[in-house]
């Protein structure tokens, strides 16, 4: 009897584990993206592609961790009660998304690097991620700390969707597939990323692939693919697709989206070539001393803003923080450090709630909503 019960328990556990594994793997092959040959056919056309991989203009080390440092970081990220989690539910704004003409200059932040930029009558959606996890699986991987503040179907018509690179927290298969049916806008992506989109059914005539310092026109809006200091990859291969930041040059305003990047000397050239920018969206989170070259810290974000603007003019809106736990720093620390670094440099910073729309030309009141 005991032996039979043990066999039954073991069988039940195995079945449960197998069911969980099947659920974890559901959809994973498609989410991994295109095969290497499809990517290489496009990527190898670039002078920035060498020996089978793209390279940074500024050399960048990936990760430098000893075993104990790795253990501490993993523990911090998996612990249910840790400083990297918010102390209370994250408040959301009621999105104020106009159905009429886009503003001269405004931005609505939806969390992490997802934002709706309005510039001179055009709307641009950056790094759209609406999934619950930034992972090839819907069971494992970094999970949202707050829900999307607006439903994808509630977005107004956009004029372009811009992707910075192919990491899961910036390129989400479910969101991309949904946008194909909901929107008519083209996808502007760095070289090689188009292969992922094609493998997911995005029509070729809606994909614009660009190398660094190449541009595309969306009517009167010039969209320029410019360098970033980072890396790429969705599985075992690394750096076979390009990573980028983006400059938006309208008839009257200029905006810059940093994507995902470490600090780079390229910022000065980007500002000289395409700035000065009236608005910057710059990453401030997921930093760590173990990977200083690929993720800026808040102080470096202020420095980058100074590089691409006219002596710190314009407004800095932080992105790449608050939504997914990708590093063990305290949850609200990026904003506190950003504000402390911005004040002596006289840099104007707006920190919108998820879903909040910011107008750089309108009245500003900085409410410390992140101090939960």
UniProtKB/Swiss-Prot annotation:
The keyword Lipid metabolism does not apply. It holds the Pfam family Lactamase_B_2. Residues 1-33 form the signal peptide. Keywords: Signal. The keyword Signal applies. GO terms for cellular component: cytoplasm. One of its GO terms (molecular function) is N-acylphosphatidylethanolamine-specific phospholipase D activity. PANTHER family: N-ACYL-PHOSPHATIDYLETHANOLAMINE-HYDROLYZING PHOSPHOLIPASE D. To K.pneumoniae RomA. This is Uncharacterized protein Mb0930. It comes from Mycobacterium bovis (strain ATCC BAA-935 / AF2122/97). The lineage of its organism: Bacteria, Bacillati, Actinomycetota, Actinomycetes, Mycobacteriales.
């Amino acid at each position: 009897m005991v032996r039979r019960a043990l066999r039954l328990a073991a069988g039940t556990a195995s079945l449960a584990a197998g069911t969980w594994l099947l659920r974890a793997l559901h959809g994973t092959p498609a989410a991994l993206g295109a095969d290497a040959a499809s990517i290489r056919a496009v990527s190898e056309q670039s002078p920035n592609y060498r020996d089978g991989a793209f390279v940074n203009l500024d050399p960048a080390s990936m990760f430098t961790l000893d075993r104990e440092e790795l253990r501490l970081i993993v523990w911090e990220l998996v612990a249910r009660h840790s400083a990297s989690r918010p102390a209370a539910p994250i408040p959301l704004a009621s999105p104020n998304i106009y159905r009429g003409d886009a503003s001269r200059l405004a931005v609505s932040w939806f969390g992490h690097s997802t934002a709706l930029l309005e510039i001179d009558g055009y709307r641009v959606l950056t790094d759209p991620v609406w999934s619950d996890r930034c992972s090839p699986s819907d069971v494992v991987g970094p999970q949202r700390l707050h829900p999307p503040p607006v439903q994808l179907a509630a977005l107004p018509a956009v004029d372009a969707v811009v992707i910075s690179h192919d990491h899961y927290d910036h390129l989400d298969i479910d969101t991309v597939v949904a946008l194909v049916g909901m929107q008519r806008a083209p996808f502007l992506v760095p070289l090689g990323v188009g292969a992922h989109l094609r493998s997911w059914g995005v029509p070729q005539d809606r994909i614009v692939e660009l190398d660094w310092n190449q541009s595309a026109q969306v009517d009167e809006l010039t969209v320029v693919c410019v360098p970033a200091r980072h890396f790429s990859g969705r599985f075992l291969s690394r750096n076979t697709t390009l990573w980028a930041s983006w400059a938006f040059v309208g008839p009257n305003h200029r905006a810059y989206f940093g994507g995902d990047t470490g600090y780079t000397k390229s910022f000065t050239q980007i500002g000289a070539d395409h700035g000065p920018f009236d608005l910057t969206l710059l990453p401030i989170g997921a930093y760590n001393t173990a990977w200083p070259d690929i993720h800026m810290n808040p102080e470096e974000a202020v420095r980058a803003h100074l590089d691409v603007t006219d002596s710190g003019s314009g407004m800095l809106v932080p992105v790449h923080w608050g939504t997914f736990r990708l590093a063990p720093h305290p949850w609200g620390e990026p904003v506190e450090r950003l504000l402390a670094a911005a004040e002596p440099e006289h840099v104007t910073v707006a920190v919108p709630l998820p879903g909040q729309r910011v107008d750089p030309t309108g009245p500003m009141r900085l409410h410390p909503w992140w101090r939960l």
